[in-house]
């Protein structure tokens, strides 16, 4: 198995890495992984729960939506949210600036989709701290129709 490290950042929580590998047992499928130390945070092999979070979380809402997502990862929840025509604005908050940088640099498959959609804003921050004070630091009065975590 050939593993290529695409990104690395030392964080207070450990080493954060973005890896790409080709899985020969799956017909040469390209797999992207985000790891923190020895733990897998995200893999492009298993994305159904991330997609369903957006599909089910937004499915019953039938108006223009302002949505916030906690955690960017490989971007599957955010991309699925943007498929919903009612999503007017999407704010995605991730603890690690490196994860946002990887998307902005096009190192992950969903990076160009998210950075190319004017409805989507990627922002670094502590989602849980911001939940207490307001997710949008530039507009603390901003209200969200859905919070996906």
Located regions from the model:
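Short, conserved beta-strand segments within well-ordered enzyme catalytic domains
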Residues: 17, 33-35, 68
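A short, structured beta-strand/loop element
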Residues: 27-42
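A generic short-segment signal for beta-strand/edge and adjacent turn/coil regions
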Residues: 1-5, 35-39, 61, 88-93
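N-terminal auxiliary segments of SAM/dcSAM-dependent transferases
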Residues: 1-31
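The AdoMet/dcAdoMet-binding core of the Class I SAM-like
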Residues: 47-149
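Generic "edge-of-domain/loop-turn" microfeature
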Residues: 23-25, 41, 88
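Residue-level preference for alpha-helix termini and adjacent loops
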Residues: 7, 40-41, 71
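Pocket-edge structural micro-motifs
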Residues: 20-22, 36-38, 45
